């Protein structure tokens, strides 16, 4: 899991328009109180996974914080390593995730894990360098690094910003696959790259709908569902007095 935390941090930096080769990491680890070999094994295995990625990508972690007291009575926090990726980039090269223009194509720059489910580092490096190059050439105009919600989460959140419609067609098994390392991109032209798969296009935005495998979803309903979970804790509206 920690290996993919590092991968996700890199993917997010790339999707914003920066070069992953110049980035640095900071880690936040949070684990239960250490009491036996099993509990000690959780942070050890997580840090080994993160270190393996650092070595293979040739990138250092320059800071972080650990918390090893995530236990209250018989309740333990879920074991976690969170990776933050930082770098600098020319402001003119930075892009944002929301869909930009009707008629643009949507491609998935896909990462395929190794047989043991570990990241394919060589493929990731090639994919990220290609995406960075296409952003510099202003062919890729928006991008979203896939996370726990897969392609479904990515296309929904990309549609929220400008309310543009989109149509995508993908294997249903791929819709909610984690997809860490993969990036969904909006392209003004076309992509000629082995790991770039055409999955859809941006449409006019008049209906405020996403069409996924022929099924239509109202964008505003999706936005409400996305914010509902934390609305009581972090309300985004309030009554006027």
Predicted feature descriptions by range:
Residues 43-45, 60, 66-177, 188-241:
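Intein/HINT protein-splicing elements and their conserved insertion hotspots or analogous self-processing inserts
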Residues 185:
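Catalytic core of tubulin tyrosine ligase-like
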Residues 179-181:
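A structural-propensity feature for long, helix-poor, extended segments
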Residues 1-66, 70:
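A glycine-rich phosphate/pyrophosphate-binding beta-strand-loop-alpha-helix module
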